[in-house]
Design a protein with these regions (language model features):
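Positively charged n-region of N-terminal signal peptides that target proteins for export
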Residues: 1-4
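Sec/Tat signal peptide C-region and signal peptidase I cleavage site
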Residues: 15-20
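Mid-length scaffold segments of soluble, non-membrane domains
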Residues: 82, 89-161
């Protein structure tokens, strides 16, 4: 039972990255294709269970993490963000954006070495721009593959059929960090290193968005529908690479909701 809970928790932290863009900004486009909520009754039940788990586990842990000094949390965020380049770069290539692939490769090399494993974003300081994160779900979308039905996965949260498939590509060989730490079986890295990075990604994300999610829940007539709309619009924006923004959530990831 303990092992099952551990796997579910890690799964949640793996999927939280699908919300966060570069610097964690969540941007919503004005136009997005409608996505069917084929399993809405079941999705709502799963959503309610997830919210219960968040209140008793994830949110308290996130509050504890926020006790750490801001520079420490910033360094952790930078290091975790640096690792996401290992998924972003191959997706830049798959999407035909070789310029961004080259820049992100340079960012990763500089920050991993001079920036001490990514703790310091030296690359941005010397002029390497920071682009939005890319993932396999986005790449499938650029290939014209539709999102399929909207899903709320246990513990993991909002997704679609396409995004779920894209996320599983990571653990099927599409994530070099997963391959190096879990599959390589070397003396320097192990599955514990990967698990730790995923857990910290989730904790960092949740800690940045405590007030945002509280405000969203407080001001929503239907919290489930609000989260669904937020997720689907954000994913569509990232796939289309639009800069037409209706709302931006920030605090590195989702600090506050600003309605135009």
């Amino acid at each position: 039972m303990k092992k099952i809970l551990t796997i579910l928790t890690l799964s949640f932290f793996i999927f939280t990255n699908s919300f966060a863009g570069s610097d964690g900004e969540l941007n919503l486009s004005k136009k997005s294709k409608p996505v069917k909520d084929c399993f809405e009754p079941l999705n709502r039940i799963t959503f309610a269970i997830n919210m219960g788990l968040d209140k008793v586990i994830f949110k308290p842990v996130a509050k504890g993490y926020r006790v750490l000094p801001s520079p420490v949390r910033a360094g952790v965020s930078n290091a975790l963000d640096n690792l996401t380049n290992l998924v972003t770069i191959p997706n830049n290539v798959l999407q035909g954006d070789l310029k961004k692939a080259g820049i992100n490769t340079g960012r990763f090399a500089i920050n991993t070495t001079i920036g001490v494993l990514g703790i310091f974003d030296v690359a941005e300081f010397i002029g390497f721009p920071k682009y939005e994160k890319e993932d396999y779900g986005q790449t499938l979308g650029t290939y014209g593959i539709g999102p399929g039905c909207y899903l709320v996965l246990p513990v993991i949260g909002p997704s679609t059929v396409r995004d779920t498939a894209g996320s599983f590509i990571n653990v099927m060989g599409g994530d070099p960090w997963y391959n190096a730490s879990v599959n390589a079986n070397n003396e320097y890295l192990s599955d514990k290193a990967y698990a730790a990075s995923r857990v910290m990604t989730g904790v960092d994300f949740r800690a940045k968005n405590i007030e945002t999610l509280d405000n969203l829940e407080k001001n929503s007539m239907d919290f489930y529908a609000s989260v669904r709309s937020l997720y689907l619009q954000d994913r569509q924006m990232k796939i289309s690479n639009t800069e037409d923004i209706v709302e931006t959530m920030d605090d590195s990831d989702w600090e506050e909701i600003e309605a135009n």
